[in-house]
């Protein structure tokens, strides 16, 4: 059963030294991201616990993604939680949604019971703010089958540089990451609501593909001082 760690292993074999993930302070190649994910997978495997759903809570987007990928390699079904999820809320979410394990810096047993659909390789949490997030499952094919057409329509290819801002627990950002991985492209990730710093990152990295939710895109458009000649695609979508 194919998953995104399998895809990363393939891309890292083809493009080991190509820059994959970028933040203000980090530049990681495909090989480096793969190595970090394999290290996390080895840590999970050393625990010798039954496989199941795993709620992952990290503040840093690179750490979110390497744990997400490593969990898949280790045979778990990863679920990225919001970075501000407190231990108490994580445990409540685990109990209400039947998530088997929690790793928010401390790995611990959660609440078993959630039935994982056949073929599911990850869980995603709904972004509704009125209640506890719902847990939805995704197969690899549910996204990956659309990547060839998405990449064609939006011009996402190996030399593309995409930009997102915010947590990878948001489905929109995670989907962009997955598309970038499929294309063998690069992903620049802004951290925090600092549009002037996003502007610096876009110029510095020569971003070609911009993805922001509408409210953040409007905020960004208010502060930009120069045209971005490198940007060919702008996407405004939901998180």
PLM feature segments, named:
Residues 1-19, 118-121:
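A short N-terminal helical cap/helix-turn-helix that marks the beginning
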Residues 193, 207-239:
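Adenylate-forming
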